């Protein structure tokens, strides 16, 4: 898809407690058509800042009038987006408890690949967005021949298995190579998700699996509670959108798991949202979202403890009650299949994309056998 660079300037102003001392900065954005259906007709869903790094920069999330895909529009282009991924964004926590969490999560992720794992003979896995390589190493220990894709500098640290250090859609391999391809919390970050789905179809062997996790745009958490990591999250998908992407790419949906088994997506601020929209009959904007307890402590320079807890209760009684309601709200969401994130398992069709397709971006020649840094 051809993208038009517009000279749109991001809105720049302070947002409540997130207002910082940083000077206003002009950000050149691009306006794009829907990546799924090509329509340029859309409506605004919400506006919110980059709460993580640049709280004075606001972005707009829109929904396509034709297919319902959600996306940031206008958005930072491929060059501009780099400033929103500083080096420390890729730093992982180092603690025994976090290591245990990763092992538990990787075990759950591996279950989605059991069908392939139980087949006789060697099996090859490509993990897209492999970060520092921990999940591929986990799978290698289970007997898989692993490779990864990671465009950040962290990929340079990986020496024990092959890594593609460029966009997944741009790697030069075109023939069916892998028994499984995984993308955990990746497809919401990319500028051209259709190219990623198509590339997965090209590289999968017949009957191979594409397993991916992403936010659920049909959920209150994603759509209404301002917990998406904008502008790093660029796209927001419903299950209908996923089915359409898979159809275009020659993949068939096998199942969706909407239970939050890989990444949790807690409905924080659900009660304040319900009070505002159902009782007060008013719109719930980003400025209406209470600070989290962590944000509140940081703002007021408080240590975690009873004093901080009481002050937070006085600041937002609804938020304190909200936290206690999460388990019940999540249980209902899971029953209704409206939890904040979903994991999908798709299979390659017998007849799918065969030609070597690349987007307009520059392609660098590489092969998994070349090892790290390619």
Question: What positions do the PLM features span?
Answer:
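Short hydrophobic/aromatic beta-strand or adjacent loop that forms the aromatic wall/cage
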Residues: 57-61, 68, 184, 338-344
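Conserved SAM-binding loop
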Residues: 14, 22-32, 108-251, 256, ...
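Short hydrophobic transmembrane-like helices used for membrane targeting/insertion
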Residues: 1, 5-9, 353, 363-366, ...
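Conserved SAM-binding loop and adjacent beta-strand
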Residues: 95-111
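N-terminal juxtadomain amphipathic helix
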Residues: 5, 9, 18-97
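S-adenosyl-L-methionine-dependent methyltransferase catalytic module, highlighting the catalytic core
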Residues: 191-199, 209-350
């Amino acid at each position: 898809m051809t993208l038009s660079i517009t000279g749109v300037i991001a809105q720049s102003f302070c947002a409540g407690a997130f207002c910082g001392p940083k000077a206003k900065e002009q950000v050149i954005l691009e306006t794009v058509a829907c990546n799924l259906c090509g329509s340029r007709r859309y409506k605004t869903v919400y506006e919110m800042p980059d709460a993580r790094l640049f709280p004075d920069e606001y972005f707009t999330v829109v929904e396509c009038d034709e297919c319902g895909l959600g996306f940031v529009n206008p958005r930072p282009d491929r060059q501009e987006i780099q400033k929103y991924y500083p080096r420390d964004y890729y730093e992982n926590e180092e603690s025994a408890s976090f290591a245990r969490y990763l092992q538990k999560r990787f075990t759950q992720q591996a279950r989605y690949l059991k069908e392939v794992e139980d087949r006789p003979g060697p099996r090859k896995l490509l993990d897209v967005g492999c970060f520092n390589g921990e999940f591929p190493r986990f799978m290698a220990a289970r007997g898989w021949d692993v490779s990864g894709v990671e465009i950040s500098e962290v990929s340079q640290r990986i020496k024990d298995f092959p890594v593609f250090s460029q966009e997944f859609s741009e790697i030069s391999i075109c023939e069916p190579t892998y028994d499984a391809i995984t993308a955990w919390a990746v497809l919401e970050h990319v500028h051209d998700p259709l190219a990623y789905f198509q590339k997965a179809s090209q590289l999968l062997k017949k009957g191979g699996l594409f397993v991916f996790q992403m936010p659920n745009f049909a959920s209150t958490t994603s759509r209404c509670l301002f917990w998406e990591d904008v502008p790093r999250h660029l796209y927001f998908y419903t299950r209908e959108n996923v089915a359409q992407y898979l159809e275009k790419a020659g993949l068939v949906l096998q199942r969706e798991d909407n239970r939050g088994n890989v990444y949790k997506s807690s409905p924080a601020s659900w009660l304040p949202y319900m009070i505002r929209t159902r009782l007060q009959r008013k719109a719930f904007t980003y400025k209406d979202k209470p600070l989290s307890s962590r944000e509140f402590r940081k703002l007021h320079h408080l240590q975690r403890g009873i004093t901080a807890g009481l002050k937070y209760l006085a600041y937002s009684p609804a938020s304190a009650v909200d936290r206690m309601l999460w388990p019940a709200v999540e249980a209902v969401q899971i029953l209704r299949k409206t939890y904040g994130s979903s994991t999908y398992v798709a299979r390659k069709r017998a007849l799918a994309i065969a030609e070597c397709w690349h987007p307009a971006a520059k392609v660098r020649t590489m092969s998994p056998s070349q090892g790290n840094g390619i």
